[in-house]
Amino acid sequence: MMWVIDTSALIRLFVPDGPLHPEIETAFNRAATGADLVLAPHLLLAEAASVLLRKRRRDELSTEELRELLQAVESLPIRLCEHGPLLFPACALAEAHGLSAYDALYLAVAEQHSARLITNDEGLAKVARAIGLA
């Protein structure tokens, strides 16, 4: 099975400020054995760094914790996808469903690979369900 993970779900693995997505552990456990594939646009790394930096600036993380979490994010079995070729499909999804281009890129990756989206963003999850990607 193929999965696409967004930043909202990924960050919860490391900073438990809410419930984990019910399928995230299964997806990563299966990806670690090669049974499943977890995908994301390259954008994921920048978004994850931005969220963690924001937490660092609010003193919710130390500088060392920030570094460790960034290394942990990079070490996960996630295949990063070029998102440049997906800009037009992502913009079409964003326009049709009232999403940001950022969120729509995750849907475009999921659509391209017939994958299921793992997100903790309720608005994005609702759209993913509506178009058969959740």
Where are these regions (language model features)?
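Acidic catalytic patch
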Residues: 42-45, 65-96
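Short glycine/serine- and small hydrophobic-enriched flexible loop segments
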Residues: 50-57, 112
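Short beta-strand scaffold positions
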Residues: 5, 39-40, 81, 101, ...
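Short, well-structured N-terminal submotif of metal-dependent ribonuclease cores
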Residues: 1-43, 55-68
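Alpha-helix capping/helix-boundary segments
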Residues: 9-10, 44, 85-86, 106, ...
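Acidic, PIN/NYN-like endoribonuclease modules and their adjacent C-terminal/linker elements
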Residues: 1-2, 107-134
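Residues that scaffold the ATP/ADP-binding catalytic core of kinase and kinase-like folds
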Residues: 12-14, 51, 127
